[in-house]
Amino acid sequence: MAHQHTISGLVGKLITESEVNCNADKYYQIFKHHEDLPSAIPHIYTSVKAVEGHGTTSGCVKEWCYILEGKPLTVKEKTTYNDETRTINHNGIEGGMMNDYKKFVATLVVKPKANGQGSIVTWIVDYEKINEDSPVPFDYLAFFQQNIEDLNSHLCASD
């Protein structure tokens, strides 16, 4: 597990990255085909649904209900996909987190390991705080790290 952060005033970037045992395509596809996430890791996601467009098409808007530090929260985000690079951008547009951030983009990147055994999963959080009092979203960095670990356990158990 590796963590990086770059913070300059109101703008910052947080990164968490881990190796997983799962196939890169399988890991990427469960996030692209989001309907299975609440049953795979229900302690993290309580529901997710496309509210505009088709959920697997770039430009769709999804509503995610999730648990962060024991609190139920909801966010609407615009999603873009790059199947070639196994990259998904989640651009927050509405919900509780947008009370603290002008911009909140969470990017998932899944790369196969060079030896063909498993993958490297990276979550990148690019954000711009509304003001100096808005927190650096370290809680979301921990949330995405938990996503990596718990989804890996679920997917490997189902192999």
From Swiss-Prot:
Biological process annotations from GO: defense response
Taxonomic source organism: Papaver somniferum (Opium poppy)
SMART domains: Bet_v_1
Cellular compartment(s): Vacuole; Cytoplasmic vesicle
Pfam families: Bet_v_1 (PF00407)
SUPFAM superfamilies on file: Bet v1-like
Similarity field: Belongs to the MLP family.
Coiled coil residues, start to end: none
Known function: Not known; MLPs constitute up to 50% of the soluble latex protein.
Domain of life the protein comes from: Eukaryota
Name the UniProt record assigns to this protein: Major latex protein 15
